[in-house]
Amino acid sequence: MISVSNVTMRYGSKILFEDVSTQFISGRRYGLTGPNGAGKSTFMKVLTGELEAQKGVVVRPRKLGILRQDQYAFDAYRVIDTVIMGNAPLWAALEERENLYNKAELTDEDGSRLGELEGIVGDENGYEAEADAAILLQGLDIPDSVHERKMSELQGGQKVRVLLAQALFGSPDALLLDEPTNYLDLESVHWLQDFLLAYRGTLITISHDRHFLNAVCTHIADIDYQTIITYNGGYDDMVMQKVSVRTRIESQNEEREKKIEQLNDFIARFSAGTRSSQVNSRKKEVERLATTELARSNIQRPFIRFDMLRPSGKHVLEIEGVTKTYDTPAPDGTTGPVFTPFTCSLLRGDKVILMGRNGTGKTTLIKSLLSGVPDVQDNDFVRTHGDVKWGHEAQIGYFAQDHKAAIQHGTTVAEWLHGFDPKKSTEEIRGILGQMLFRGEEGTKKTDALSGGEAARLLFCKLMMQKPNILILDEPTNHLDLESINALNQSLQKYEGTVLLVTHDQDLIEEVGTRIWHFEHGKVTDHKGPYEEYQQQLAMSAK
């Protein structure tokens, strides 16, 4: 169990949460939610001890499993060792034992200490540590061939999965996971869900994956109104319960403001008259109400709407024998084509979900389709095999997986966006930015200083302004909060153009897609139907 008593955190004059007291009970699985900027990551750091609360006390269990966000902290270590380091007492004992065995001669004191260390290793299941770590890595799709490599040799997505295995290792009393599904493919997300459902300690997770929160969490701890309110059930249950809480709090705010307005009106009308005692009484009442201002919600909802300047022709895309061969081995050591030659055609209005494990070629196929297309092609990428023909009036809007690299540095948010349509007025640019929560002076923010979520929202501004009839989105939900993901989901469902979408977000897969391209075992399978139908087909084939 983790106990929080009277905890307060502020940044300058901004209150994130104040005098929060709550308990996270063993056997329960908590989702920590709230809009961006509400203080989720700050509160998580207070729970782990990385940050000290400005006021209040946090009581933690001895063994915490923590998903660390620093991908480079373990570059000097083997992958398998990085996982084992998740059990700090075991790793300390293993290191000390190795140092003693490396001594030229052992003293009696050293021998006694070795006996103590062997006891610790045994108590912590250290003799099975490498086997247990390997099972975790395999579940997270880190192949055996990588386990002995240094962390510095891995790509970013692989590093995150190793760090997730580190957090899960050693049967911790509590798990604190900040965005555990980032960079996980759908199969790995399902494996993680099953693991967490069987976990018997205390789980606290920050996630912007609604489906994951609904599947895993027994409770939601929501940061809003400068406090933390815990709701029973998953994310959707919390949303329904929060409506009544929000209605009550906002009604109290409205009543308070109306009362202040009435009192000020009385003061203005009678301050020069004979009713001075009544005026003074009302002034005191205004002061009292002003000092007891009720907190307001931090929730901000972006507005995303993808329109088309003009529709494309009926036949949007013809793909003939497309594949890609790299000159150097892939990160897992394999060579040859990423997938067998793929042939397919798309019609106007198709909404295709590209899904499959990481590294199976989804982004490679996207880049192959865009090779040779001005403004959206990757200049460092060359399609090695096959032909691609885009149809009449095809206008492509592209959201790359490395979306921050698509935004020019050394300028402001408004200037960068204005560059794509100089004919638009400053007011029109501000209006588009405002839809994606860049309000007031935020339009003058330097592009170099944008967070991942802000960069994503800025790219959506560009796509809305360009009004393409084909949207190609490669992992657009990374770094978005739940409100932004829900807005994107709704906009893609309403969009009348053609969509190619790489995502591991199950809600997007189920609710947006009308067609599936599944990448598996070096092959791309084209299923002309939604995800639910595809799952039914797979189930029938398995019988």
Q: Over which residues does each language-model region extend?
A:
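Short secondary-structure transition/capping segments
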Residues: Q252, R256, Q300-D307
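Active-site phosphate-binding and catalytic loops of NTP-dependent enzymes
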Residues: H147, L294-R301, G386
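Intracellular alpha-helical coupling/juxtamembrane segments of multi-pass membrane proteins
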Residues: Q241-F266, F270, V279-A295
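Conserved short loop/turn motifs at secondary-structure junctions
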Residues: S152, F270-S271
